[in-house]
């Protein structure tokens, strides 16, 4: 599987990064263990990349333990959730977990999960407005704008 091959790709510098930056987007299966997630994050970090864990609100290991989520951030990972989860479009539990991440200042990025714009219309504006209302404008600016711009700066795009 790709996850098993990840350390080899990273060591050979053949893994696709975000916009040519040092950031690597990691995605896991819903039931992957905390140990598995921790090992993958460690592998990415040990190869000099900066891991962003995508859809962190979908994984049982992170949702059931904000402490584990905090440990991942302490290791050097950044956490990303989907805007629809923040807005409560999927489950109440996902929305609650997203709120906990924001209150603990663990959330790094918000994504649209819009692989195409016909069937999954991005709702970033509504998400930014919601976060701004709940957490303040500066916080919303950081997770919706400043942190993503950090990736582009790292890639030399700006």
What are the language-model segments listed below?
Residues 58-62, 86-89, 115-119:
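Active-site environment of divalent metal-dependent phosphoester hydrolases
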């Amino acid at each position: 599987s790709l996850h098993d091959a990840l350390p080899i790709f990273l060591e050979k510098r053949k893994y696709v990064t975000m916009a040519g930056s040092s950031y690597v987007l990691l995605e896991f299966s819903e039931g992957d263990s905390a140990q598995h997630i921790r090992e993958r994050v460690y592998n990415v970090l040990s190869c000099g990349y900066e891991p962003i864990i995508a859809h962190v609100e979908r994984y049982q290991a992170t949702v059931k333990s904000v402490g584990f989520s905090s440990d991942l951030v302490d290791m050097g990972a950044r956490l990303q959730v989907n805007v629809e989860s923040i807005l409560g479009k999927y489950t109440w539990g996902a929305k609650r977990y997203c709120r906990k991440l924001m209150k603990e200042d663990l959330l790094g990025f918000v994504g649209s999960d819009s692989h195409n714009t016909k069937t999954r219309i991005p709702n970033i504006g509504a998400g930014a407005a919601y976060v701004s209302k709940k957490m303040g404008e500066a916080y919303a600016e950081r997770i919706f704008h400043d942190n993503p711009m950090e990736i582009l700066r790292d890639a030399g795009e700006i």
